[in-house]
Curated annotation (Swiss-Prot):
This protein's pathway: Protein degradation; proteasomal ubiquitin-dependent pathway
The protein's name: Nuclear protein localization protein 4 homolog
Compositional bias ranges of the Low complexity kind: 72-94
Job description of the protein: May be part of a complex that binds ubiquitinated proteins and that is necessary for the export of misfolded proteins from the ER to the cytoplasm, where they are degraded by the proteasome.
Keyword Nucleus: no
Amino acid sequence: MIIAVRSPSGTTKINVSDTAIVKDLYVKLKENNVDIDGKSITKTPRDPPLEVGDKLSSLGIKSGDLLHLVGNNNNNNNDNKASSGSNNNNNNNNISKKEISYDEKLPNGLTPRCKHAVGDKCVFCSDAQGMKRCDHPENATCPNCQNKKFKGKRLKWLCNHPAGGKCSNCLRVGKNVSYKCNHGSTATCVNCMDKDDEDQDDNEEDNKDNKDNSEIKKSGFVPKVAIKNEVKTKCLHGPNQKCINCLPKDDPNSIEVPKRRCKNHGINGSCVECIEWRESLKMRLKSQDNPHAPGALVDFQSANIFQQYIANSKYEQQRIGFLFGNFLSDGSVVVDSIYEPPQECKDKQTPTLLPDPLADKIESMASMLGLTRVGWIFSHPSRKYTMSSTEIIQAASYQNKYGPSFVTLILSVNSDGQSNMEAFQVSDQALKLEKTGEFLPTQPDPTKCKLKSPVFEEGTETINADTHFFIVTVPLKAREDKSIFNISFPVENRIPVNTLSDLASYKLEHKDVSPLKFFSDFHFLIFLLENQFLDFQSDFPIICENIRSRSSENLIGYLEIINYQIGDIIGHDQFN
C-alpha cells in the first residue's frame, strides 16, 4: 500500500507491504534522503508519536492515508541543554504575550483575532463566544455566533451575494425590496424580514397590553383575545415560520386578479407564457351540483296566500316578495313570512320594484322579531326556461348582499294550468361574475347572460353564457313546526289597498283571542307601522319582544289603544 508522509521538506510517498510496521516507514524515509533525526511519525501534527513496532494495519492506517513527520521537542531540549534556557524563556514570553492578546480586549473593544471594523462585533468580542454549534475556524464568525441582541451592521465580508441582495448574515439591514417578494401578505422571506421593525412592533404590543390591563382593572371586563402564532397540527415548524399548509389558500371566487411575476421580463413586459397564463384565468363554465342551502323549509300557509292571489288574477298579475325567517346551522332556510314591497307589473312579466319608504323600518322590525331576510319569491307565467338572465343577475345580487344561503322561490304554472313552486340558488360562478360587474345591464336574450369578458362554455369562448350553468336546485320542504305568526290580516301593497275598515274587520274577527295572538301577525304589524298607530322607537320594541318571548304581559295596554282607535270608526258598543 502507498502511504504519504508530510515533513518540513515536503510530502513523500512510500510503498510498503500490508504487514509493514512503523519502523519500515522510517527506513523508507531515510532511503529517500529525508532527515528523520529527532523526528517522529504521527497521524496528525498534534497526536502522540506512533510506536516503532506497531503494525500499520492495527493502527487503522490504510493505503492513501497521510501521516506527518514532526520534530521531537524533548530530544531537541536534551541535545541542546546549553542553549535551551534562553530559548525557553523567549518561548514562554511569546506564549504569555499571545495568551494576553487573545484573552484581553484592546482599548477599542476589539481583540487581535477580530478582522472587522470598530463598531462591528464577532464571536471573539461579543457575548456569544463559546457556542458549540459553530464549525468555522477560530479567526472567522457566522450568524450563529453573532450576538443576537446586536443591532449594528453585519459583517459584510461573510456575504457572498451581489449588491442589493440579502442572506442570513445581513437580514437585519433595513432595506426592503418589495417587488422581489412573491409570497402572500401573511408570509415572510429573507427580502422582507426586518428585525428592527419586529422589535418596534413588540414594544407597541407591550404598551398596548399594559393599557388594556389598566382598562380591564377599571371596568372589570376581560375581552376575548385570539391566540397569535397558532401552529396548525400538520405543520412541523415553529410559530414564527410558514409552510404550504399554513399559507392562505387561494379563493377560486375571489374578485381580485392574481398577480404573476414572470422571470422572462420586467413588471410591464409580456411573453407567450404570460399570455397563456392570462388565458387560463378565464372562467370555464360548469354546473354546480350542491347548493349552499341544503333545503328551504317554507311556511306553506304564507306560500298559499301568495299563490292564491296570483291564481285569482289568472296569472295576469305577477308578484315579488321577500322571505323573512332564519338560517339554520347547516345553511338551510326557514321561512316564516312573506313581505310584498311596492311593485308594478306590466305585460304579465316579472314586476318592477318601486321605491319603498318603509324598507328600513320593516327590516328593523323583523330584526326585533328575531327574523332576517333569507330569500325572495316571484311568479311568472308559463315559459320554456326556469330563470331569465335578468332574474339570475338579480338573484346573484341578493345572494352576494344577504349571504350565500339566500334562496330564490319561483311560483309558476305548468302546461296543465296547475301552480308549481320550486327553490333555487345561483352558482358561485354567477356570484363572482356579479361581484366583478361582468354582467351587462341590458340582457336582450332571457336564456343567455351577456358578459363583458369572454368565458369558456364547453370548450368554446363566448360572451353569451347559457343560464343553465348558473342555476342550482334547492330541495323544497314543508315546515314540521308551526310558525309563531298568524296570517289573517290582508297583505300589504296589494290591490285594493288596506284601509281602516280592514283594521276594524280584523279586530271583530279576533275580539276573543289573547293579546299575544292578536299582535302575532306580520302583516298587521306592517299596517300599524305604515299608519303610525304606535311609536316605532318606543312601542314596537316592546311589542316585538313580547311576541318573541310568547308573553302577553305588556300587550294589554297596546290592545286598549287599538280598541279605542277602532271604536271611533265602528262604535265603541261593538266591543261590549
